[in-house]
Amino acid sequence: MNILRAKAEHIIYAKQISLCIDESAKVRGTGIARRTPEYLATKIENGNAVIALDENQFAGFCYIEVWGHGKYVAHSGLIVAPEFRGRGLAKKIKKEVFNISLEQYPKAKIFGITTGQAVMKINYELGYKPVHFSELTDDPEFWKGCQTCKNFDILTRTERKLCLCTGTVSYTHLTLPTT
């Protein structure tokens, strides 16, 4: 299993990743925003994604989004193909995405939103803390990404204060002593 920073050569997996995210949303019955293959391809092409491959078979994926002129970094679209679940792969992918975020945006507030129990567990194990949505980016472009989620009406009705998702933030890198 190889977990690596995605490059242009990995764009061939964008459609498969998009379908995997869609299928996961259907199976779970909870909200997951849809990501088009074209959108995922831009993340891959820009080096703002991590892909896991077993030989040449897609196994998992996650990407980085930057908001507020680099003040916020979101980890989004974490997905593991069904045949690779239950092996700790999601946590390994998330760690790699975290390392890339630290390398590129060392002072950014790193966050994510999820309805998934598995992602919540991973985030907790990696030191993320649950927070109110007011502690996340106020960039309207970020919140537009939620429009394809079936729970978007909740988010809009509450003026982005509440949803079924839980926001989590990692503060660990912001409190490390400088040497």
Task: Write out the residue ranges for each language-model feature.
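Conserved acetyl-CoA-binding loop-helix of GNAT-fold acetyltransferases
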Residues: 80, 86-101
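Conserved active-site tyrosine of GNAT-family acetyltransferases
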Residues: 123-125, 172
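A conserved beta-strand-loop-helix scaffold within acyl/acetyltransferase catalytic domains
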Residues: 29-49, 53-54, 58-80
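Conserved GNAT acetyl-CoA-binding A-motif
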Residues: 102-115
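Short amphipathic alpha-helix that is part of the acyltransferase structural core
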Residues: 1-35, 51-53
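Conserved small/polar residues in nucleotide/adenosyl-binding loops
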Residues: 172-178
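Conserved catalytic-core motifs of GNAT/GCN5-like acyltransferases
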Residues: 127-157
